[in-house]
Every structure is written in structure tokens, then in C-alpha cells.
Amino acid sequence: MKAVILESYVMEGGDLDWSGVKALVPDTTSYVRTAYEEIAPRIGDADIVLLNKCRMDEEILQQCPNLKWVGIIATGTDNLDLEACRRHGVAVANVPGYSTYSVAQMTFSLLLAICQCAERYNRAVKQGCWQLDIPESIGLLPQMELYGKTYGVYGYGSIGRQSARIARAFGMEVLVCTRTVRPEYAADGVEFVDYDTLLRRCDILSLHCPATPQTRGLVNAEALARMKPGAILLNTARGALVDEEAVAAALHSGQLGFYGADAFVTEPLPQESPLRAEPHAILTPHIAWTTREALQNLMDITTRNLRTWLEGNGEHIVNR
């Protein structure tokens, strides 16, 4: 067996390394990063490939006839043509649930940064200001208490559900819009509603679903107009869920109070993005999943996925 790691940077640094994978497949070649045009030549006649953001499509698969297993070092598979992989007899394994707590934590980090104006007040104190003695260059913003607010969750997978638990701990009413309501959700203390109701009633809307043909552009100008004036939108899921131009316009007009995001349509966020100019947009560079604990989970599950496949079973295969 021969393996190729196309994006080793994902799991390097500190005490994280690829030794577990290399112990399973000694003939492993590793590349820090790989551009699209380099993917097929680097895979060559390998049986196994591990990747994160690299694409895997029909064109690449045709050039790699020996490929049998793709391990995506992530949960989402937006960059992979799963049906093409299935046609070519290539199993694809993902890593579900590795960053549930970390991403939910980032969601509330963004929300608390918005509600407490922490970054602005940090600057003020370091400049020698105190309480209401804040210069105009920094600006005094009112803080917001979360208790009693209505928190809307779109998508109720493991991250959405954990986000709802945290919201309830803050004393918020939680509304959920999800495709499937399961019996075990009955004890969660949340109310299940349709999308229109979610938009109209929530003070805070948090997105926790994959980007699919049905959810791309979910939050567009029409949806934003149906939300409460001054509501908060949070996106730690996928950038494609929102129309960023519409979000920037809604921020500029005041219809949307704040936007907190860790995911964007194009990454890195382009210099010309209108979000960069909006003071009420709180943006982080898609790092919610990179806590030390989440990365260790990612490495452990990736290695286990490979081991179980080599043993003839294969965990977390998403294209059977």
C-alpha cells in the first residue's frame, strides 16, 4: 500500500504529527500544501490519499486509477464529488464530531464579543480610559444581556445541539429549525419551528448546517428583511449559507445589528469583501476547529478511519 498526504499543514505543530498514519502505511509521502493542478501528479499510483481542502473530482479520479480510499481530514465533504468517487470504487471517510465543543464555543465567543464590546473596551483601558470616559475614536457601544433573548438555531446536528444547550444555560429561549425532529430531542427544552417563524422570532440566528443545494444562500436579502431589526446573525458553519453582499448591506442599513462569522464564501476573505468595511461585522479566519483538543480528536479519528479500512471494515464511510 502507498499513501499520500496532500495537506500535512493541517496536523503539524506542537506534539501533533502523522506518525500514526505512517505506522499503518510506511510508504507515505507528505506534502505541506497542494494546488489543484498538483493533486493528480502527486497522488500518482497511490492507493490512499489524505486531504483537507483539496478537491477530488472526476478529472482527478480518471488520472488516479489505483486510488481506493480518501480520508478527508474534516467533517464537511463539499470539496469532494462523492458520487464520482463511488463510481470509481473509491471509499471516502470523513471525521464527524471532532470539533463539536470547539465550534459551539467559538459561536458563543463571537456572540459574547458582540454583546460585551470586549475588544473596544480592551482598547479603551489600554489607552488609559475608564468606564464612560471613552474617546470618540473608540466609541461607546451599549452592552446586551443574553438572558431572556430568543436564540434561533438552523441545523440541529451535534454542533447546533451543543449551541442550543449553551444558549439555554444563558437563560435564552431556543427555537430550532431542522429537517428531522428525532424522539430524543423531546427532552432538550427547545421549540421546533419552520424557517419563516425562526426568522421572525429570533433575536440571534445561528447557522449550523452543511452547504447543500438546498441551503446555499439560505440567508439572503429576503430572509434578512424578515428578521427583527437589529438582530444578530452568527455563522460558524459554511460561508455559502449566506449572501455576503446582502449581509453587508443589511449591516450598513441597520436592519442587521451584527454579523459574527468564522466561515466565508471565499477563503481567505478577499480584500474587496464589503464585510471588511463593516464595524458591526466580527470576523475570525475559519479557526473554530483548531483548538488543541479538536485537532487531537481529528488526528485520532483520521488514523482510526484508516486502520479500520485496512482491516476490511472502514468507519465513517460517507459514499457507500
PLM ranges: what are they?
Residues M1-A46, L175:
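N-terminal glycine-/charge-rich "phosphate-binding" loop or analogous flexible N-terminal tail
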Residues V32, I73-A74, V90-Y101, T178:
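Short beta->alpha connector loops at strand-helix junctions that form conserved
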Residues A46, C64, C202:
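An anion/phosphate-binding loop that grips the pyrophosphate of nucleotide cofactors and donors
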Residues E58-L61, R179-P274:
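Rossmann-like adenosine-cofactor binding region
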Residues H88, P96-T150, E184:
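Phosphate-binding beta-alpha-beta segment of Rossmann-like dinucleotide-binding domains, i.e.
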Residues V92, G230-R320:
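Rossmann-like dinucleotide-binding domain for NAD(H)/NADP(H)
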Residues Y156-G157:
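Glycine-rich Rossmann-fold phosphate-binding loop(s) that bind the pyrophosphate
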Residues G160-R161:
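N-terminal Rossmann-fold NAD(P) dinucleotide-binding loop
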